[in-house]
Amino acid sequence: MALTPLACVLLLLSMQCYISTLAVLLKSTNSKPWVNEFESIELSCMIESITTTKPRIEWKKIKNGDPSYVYFDNQISGDLERRAKIREPATLVILNATRSDSADYRCEVTAPNDQKSFDEILISLTVRVKPVVPRCSVPKSIPVGKPAELHCLEDEGYPKSQYQWFRNKEEIPLDPKSSPKFFNSTYTLDGEMGTLKFSAVRKEDAGEYYCRAKNEAGISECGPQMMEVYDINIAGIILGVVVVVMVLLCITVGIFCAYKRGYFTSQKQTGNNYKPPAKGDGVDYVRTEDEGDFRHKSSFVI
C-alpha cells in the first residue's frame, strides 16, 4: 500500500523526533555576552535534549588559540578557581570578572548513552574596563598668535577610550564652526588620540581646560588646568633692549676713561725703576773762603 504525502511527512517528523530524543543538543541564550570589570556574568549553556542521566560537562577557556580547562571533573580550575561556579545543568557563572577573562569559552557535554553523544557551543566573552584618570597636559601660558597643543591619554580602558575636551566646563565641539562660541577658533580636535591643537591662539581661548576619557564601561576626567593667553609687548621689548645697550655703552666709556687717566697702570719699585732715598741723616761740610782751609766731609750723626 502506497503512503500518501501527508503520511510521509508525518513519518519523517516522527523519525526526526525519535533521533532528537537520542541526541545531546546544546544552546545558549547569548553567544557574545559582555560585562563590566568586577561584575558577575553568566555564560549560558543549556541542554535541550539528552537521555544520559549523568553527562560529563567541561568548560574550556580559549585565548590566543590555546585552550585550558576552567571546569573539569566537577571542579572549577585554572583562571576561574574560587571566582566561578556551575549553575545546573551546565551554565558557567563568573562572579568577579577581570579584564584577563576576555576570551572564548567552550561548553562541552558528553552523553555516552545518547546516539549523538557529544555536543559543544562556543561563547565569546568581552570584559569592559572603565578608563582610569587620564594624563592631561595643558600649557600654562601662551602668547597671542602662537600655536599650542593640549594632550590627553589613558591606556587602561577597554574598549579603547574616546576623548572629549572642555573649556570652562563647556564641551569643545569637534568642529569649531558648529558652535557660535568657538566659531572663530582655529583648532583641530582628535577624539581618538586626545589631542587639541591650536594653530594660533586668541585671547578668547584662555580658560580652564580638562579632558574626559570615556568608553562603554564608564568615564574618567582629569582635573582642570588654567591656560593663560597674553599679548606680546613689542614697545616694552624694544625699550628694554635700548636700556641694556645704553648701560653697556656707559660701562664701556667709563672703563676707557679710567684707563686713559692711568687708574689701571701700576709701577713696581724694582729693577731699573728703583730710586735710592735722598741723604737726610748726613751733612757735608765744605770750607768756604772765609773759613780758611778747614774742610769737613765726614757724615756723622749727632
Curated annotation (Swiss-Prot):
Transmembrane segments annotated in the record for this chain: 236-256
Give the range the annotation lists for the signal sequence. Answer: 1-23
Q: Which UniProt keywords apply?
A: Cell adhesion, Cell junction, Cell membrane, Disulfide bond, Immunoglobulin domain, Membrane, Repeat, Signal, Tight junction, Transmembrane, Transmembrane helix
The residues covered by the Ig-like C2-type domain are 131-228
What ranges does the Extracellular topological domain annotation cover? 24-235
Task: Tell me which InterPro entries the record gives.
Answer: Ig-like_dom, Ig-like_dom_sf, Ig-like_fold, Ig_sub, Ig_sub2, Ig_V-set, JAM-C
Where in the chain are disulfide-linked cysteines found? C45-C107, C152-C211
A GO CC term? desmosome
Q: Which residues form the Ig-like V-type domain?
A: 27-124
Please name the Gene3D superfamilies in this protein's record. Answer: Immunoglobulins
Q: Write out the topological domains of type Cytoplasmic.
A: 257-302
Question: Which family is this sequence assigned to?
Answer: Belongs to the immunoglobulin superfamily.
Concerning PANTHER family, the annotation shows: JUNCTIONAL ADHESION MOLECULE 3B, JUNCTIONAL ADHESION MOLECULE C
Can you say what this protein is called? Junctional adhesion molecule 3B
